[in-house]
Regions:
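Segments forming oxygen-rich coordination pockets for charged ligands
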Residues: 1-171
Length: 171
């Protein structure tokens, strides 16, 4: 599941990711919890085939009405758009993980009609790009901060950098 766009206030920014397995176990987050709960119910109740017809990606919007925004815990009338994608061998996740381990920036293009995925060299980060036919996401290594010395200042600097999703190395 990928957050592709948001309108108004949203708990998670575009590009946020979450995975759900058939047992309802999750990794990642796309909201403050209520949307995750609904997605888990859909996957477990209807099954992934019902959510993603014929194994193809599906687009969902939460918060279209004020009642729905309140029900799913979206602050201030926010709206969140998600793309749900069934994971299979053609998802190229091992290749994407390997590129990340090798600190290579990668662009992942998901064809929304067929579910086909292609990987290309890309930039480190960026917002997802959604069209009628494709979702393009950008993955890359985290920014790295190398801190020389292990005093109090280094500790505070490292904590701030970790909070900003930096990879921190203290020498």
């Amino acid at each position: 599941v990928t957050v592709t766009r948001t309108w108004g206030s949203s708990p998670r920014p575009p590009g946020s990711l979450m995975a759900i397995n058939g047992r309802g176990e999750t990794v990642g987050s796309v909201s403050g919890g209520c949307i995750e709960d609904d997605l888990i119910r859909r996957v477990q109740g209807e099954g992934l085939d019902a959510v993603c017809a014929q194994g193809r990606p599906a687009t969902l919007r939460y918060g279209i009405s004020a009642d729905q925004a309140h029900r799913f815990g979206l602050p201030c009338g926010g709206t969140v758009e998600l793309v749900l994608e069934p994971v299979a061998a053609h998802s190229l996740l091992p290749e994407l993980l390997q590129a990340n381990l090798e600190r290579r920036s990668t662009q992942r293009r998901l064809d929304l009609r067929s579910g086909a995925v292609t990987l290309h060299e890309g930039r480190r980060d960026g917002l997802p790009e959604l069209s009628d036919h494709a979702l393009v996401t950008h993955f890359g290594p985290r920014h790295r901060l190398i801190v020389i010395g292990a005093g109090d200042l280094s500790r505070f600097l490292s904590q701030m950098a970790l909070g900003l999703n930096f990879e921190v190395i203290v020498c």
